[in-house]
């Protein structure tokens, strides 16, 4: 077995974008990772710089613990000439309420007690 294939991770095909459902022209839901054997959705804001044409540099804006998708971040980067995507990785929607198919919350229990559940392949 060649060295390059011995340690090659088995990753999904990242060239395929996740399934997406647009709410309006600046926000969307996209397919998240499977969590506890169920499909999840992620809410995000998206924006393009005014007058963009063709390829555009982009920023992916990931909030810290307890954060959310911040539309202000998207606008700030759009004003600087970047496409921007700000997602809510705590399983919440634009109103801050939990999505019925959102991923794990950002609370203490979800972050730290999940380690006690045991590992699976």
Each model region followed by its residue ranges:
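N-terminal cap/lid segment of alpha/beta-hydrolase-fold proteins
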Residues: 4-54
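Solvent-exposed loop/turn segments at secondary-structure junctions
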Residues: 35, 64-68, 91-94
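Surface-exposed beta-strand edges and their flanking turn/coil or helix-capping segments
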Residues: 40-45, 57, 73, 99
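Short, charge-rich binding segments
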Residues: 50-54, 67-68, 75-78
């Amino acid at each position: 077995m060649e060295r390059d294939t011995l340690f090659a991770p088995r990753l999904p095909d990242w060239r395929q974008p996740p399934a997406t459902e647009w709410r309006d022209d600046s926000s969307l839901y996209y397919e998240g990772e499977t969590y506890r054997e169920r499909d999840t959705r992620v809410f995000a804001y998206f924006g393009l710089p005014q007058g963009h044409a063709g390829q555009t540099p982009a920023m992916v804006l990931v909030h810290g613990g307890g954060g959310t998708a911040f539309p202000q971040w998207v606008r700030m980067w759009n004003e600087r000439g970047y496409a921007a995507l700000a997602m809510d990785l705590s399983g919440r929607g634009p109103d801050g309420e939990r999505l019925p198919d959102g991923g794990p919350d950002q609370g203490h229990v979800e972050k730290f007690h999940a380690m006690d559940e045991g590992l699976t392949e």
